[in-house]
Amino acid sequence: MKTYSSYVNFLCSLMAIDIPDICYCFKEQYYDVNGFDVEPFEMESHCKSHVIPDENRVYVNLNEMYGENDIYFILAHEIRHCAQYQATEGIGLTDIALPETIYKWKREFSRYNPCCNDESCQEVELDAMAFTWFIGKVLLNVDVDLNCDEALVEPYKQYIRRNYSLMEIKERLDYSGLEFGRNQA
């Protein structure tokens, strides 16, 4: 059973956030990021994941994934939502986004629905998509298809590219013990 704990540690270290509780479902097994059994949870069958930001909790349905990269992208996206919420609560780095963006996130999280509904025009979704794109590009050397209007995501991509240096990424890789991606970074 794979837990992706080094990858989760890398993402959380990079964004300087509290590590979320991550629960996986795979072939009727339910477990956490440490491999311990957790209470079974329900998700819509087509959902790959959902996040409960105010509980700092992520649920991942590994049965719906198309491969390892899909899992890495989903975890990056959902953990970014945790970072966004923590930023609205004053936890983590203050430079995760501009203050006006964090204010918009706070408003959106007050109405946030963690289900699989398409909320792709929300600031929290655009930023999470841009972060996923960034992680795909930097760690996996893959262009992530975001299935959205590139013009909407581009400002977030620019901010994220400026916010994380190559040196910082390499340091966080070393710190987390994450093995893959060293050649790309």
Which functions belong to the PLM regions below?
Residues 29-31, 65-66, 90, 136:
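Short, solvent-exposed loop/turn segments at secondary-structure junctions
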Residues 22-39, 57-62, 73, 172-175, ...:
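Non-catalytic terminal regions of proteins
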Residues 4, 72, 120, 124:
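Hydrophobic (often cysteine-bearing) scaffold residues that line and stabilize catalytic clefts
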Residues 79-96:
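Catalytic Zn2+-binding segment of zinc metalloproteases
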Residues 70-78:
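Short alpha-helical catalytic segment bearing the HExxH-like zincin motif
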Residues 1-21:
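Zn2+-dependent metallopeptidase catalytic core
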Residues 93-179:
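Metalloprotease/metallohydrolase-associated module, dominated by Zn2+-dependent proteases
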Residues 35-69, 82-86:
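Active-site scaffold of zinc-dependent metalloenzymes
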